[in-house]
Amino acid sequence: MASQGTKRSYEQMETGGERQNATEIRASVGRMVGGIGRFYVQMCTELKLNDHEGRLIQNSITIERMVLSAFDERRNKYLEEHPSAGKDPKKTGGPIYRRKDGKWMRELILHDKEEIMRIWRQANNGEDATAGLTHMMIWHSNLNDTTYQRTRALVRAGMDPRMCSLMQGSTLPRRSGAAGAAVKGVGTMVMELIRMIKRGINDRNFWRGENGRRTRIAYERMCNILKGKFQTAAQRAMMDQVRESRNPGNAEIEDLIFLTRSALILRGSVAHKSCLPACVYGLAVASGYDFEKEGYSLVGIDPFKLLQNSQIFSLIRPKENPAHKSQLVWMACHSAAFEDLRVLNFIRGTKVIPRGQLATRGVQIASNENMETIDSSTLELRSRYWAIRTRSGGNTSQQRASAGQISVQPTFSVQRNLPFERATIMAAFTGNTEGRTSDMRTEIIRMMENARSEDVSFQGRGVFELSDEKATNPIVPSFDMSNEGSYFFGDNAEEFDS
């Protein structure tokens, strides 16, 4: 693994920059979100959205999706070459909601992709600003992570649905770059690899010829990304085995599934970033805030402060609970779908409840839903405290690879002990330790068994008052250990179908 010196921070990945100091990073991240904000303001002008309509999260999502679609070169090329009836490859659009005579009306709009690309570049000093595009992809991914379960996808890959906490970023597009790779969970990477190996098993030519060479490079790159997420030598050595396999097949799939299970205790490093909807940045820009001058960070207090004074709305279906809709969006904004609910309760200052008990469906409204009965309400996205986002999975004693917890991938660097029964997890490891990876498997199982409960606690800082911008006085919350802290436990959330 690269030593700390060569590791780029998320913000550098996000902004495609070389090594920068903290001030430069804050400025370039500020430039990125400022560009998103300027673009949003301009789009509202183009579409003649009034202030209230511009603050509607559904309109924000449509506008974000339009610009992402305009810049999706591979798909654009595919659409040009495979024209489908009634679809103009040069246009993009979606539903825009307007307030007419006290009701919300849906209007389907179409815009030239060229025109949207022009507006985006203009808002970003004439550049393509890929970092800003990736940022919006991560926001959509975080929203999906909070809204949907991926049990079906897990089962298809031969994995256990209880591993859903490892699935962060599972809906991110391939083109999301280094910043996207950083936020993908261990389960997500494993699933991508298993899909690839399965294709290789079924299709003899998958690894052959010029295309096969490119496939092989992609396979090894994905293996390296996954290896970099593991923090113990044995897990990494197993990844080397998987990567170097001449002809990846069922043995590799077995190894990968074993590694995924091990990540429930020996947690991987997965980055967390607070990516907000474009309309939030737009509001700040419209009020004259200069992100680049002030600087911005995705992992500190800034997103909390921004949400503290942004009033945005959401459409609400008749049987939905507005407070529950707010919780869903709040969790998505902070990339907290897999965080311990007790930590979220404390930070948000209001009760955060598991997905299965939320009376709300996804944020987006399907085109066949009846608008007559749809109302809107303010999203409550404020918090009581703030905390620093983690990228390590919270294992500070790296060299001893402290253990993690089942069903939670911490988002916030907040100290807590972890609610899980080691016995439950260890039960998943009975059986197969033979084969080429036997010594590594044995070593991993030994580490998991020996994880003492203090190793299993999450070493972190505390939370901070919103007035404490420099994070000088950590408050270490004490948690009631009696209840399980997982959002998706005992759940009936809808499945994500792409």
UniProtKB/Swiss-Prot annotation:
Highest taxon of the lineage: Viruses
Keyword annotations of the record: Capsid protein, Helical capsid protein, Host nucleus, Host-virus interaction, Ribonucleoprotein, RNA-binding, Viral nucleoprotein, Viral penetration into host nucleus, Virion, Virus entry into host cell
Motif Bipartite nuclear localization signal boundaries: 198-216
Residue span of motif Unconventional nuclear localization signal: 1-18
UniProt PTM: Late in virus-infected cells, may be cleaved from a 56-kDa protein to a 53-kDa protein by a cellular caspase. This cleavage might be a marker for the onset of apoptosis in infected cells or have a specific function in virus host interaction.
Subcellular location: Virion; Host nucleus
Location, primary (coarse class): virion
SUPFAM superfamilies membership: flu NP-like
GO cellular component, one term: host cell nucleus
A GO biological-process term: symbiont entry into host cell
Molecular function as annotated in GO: RNA binding; structural molecule activity
Stretch list, region Disordered: 1-21
Protein's UniProt keywords contain Ribonucleoprotein: yes
InterPro entries recorded: Flu_NP
Pfam families, per the entry: Flu_NP
Quaternary data: Homomultimerizes to form the nucleocapsid. May bind host exportin-1/XPO1. Binds to viral genomic RNA. Protein-RNA contacts are mediated by a combination of electrostatic interactions between positively charged residues and the phosphate backbone and planar interactions between aromatic side chains and bases.
Similarity comment text for this entry: Belongs to the influenza viruses nucleoprotein family.
Function: Encapsidates the negative strand viral RNA, protecting it from nucleases. The encapsidated genomic RNA is termed the ribonucleoprotein (RNP) and serves as template for transcription and replication. The RNP needs to be localized in the host nucleus to start an infectious cycle, but is too large to diffuse through the nuclear pore complex. NP comprises at least 2 nuclear localization signals that are responsible for the active RNP import into the nucleus through cellular importin alpha/beta pathway.
Protein name: Nucleoprotein
Species, as recorded: Influenza A virus (strain A/Equine/Santiago/1/1985 H3N8)
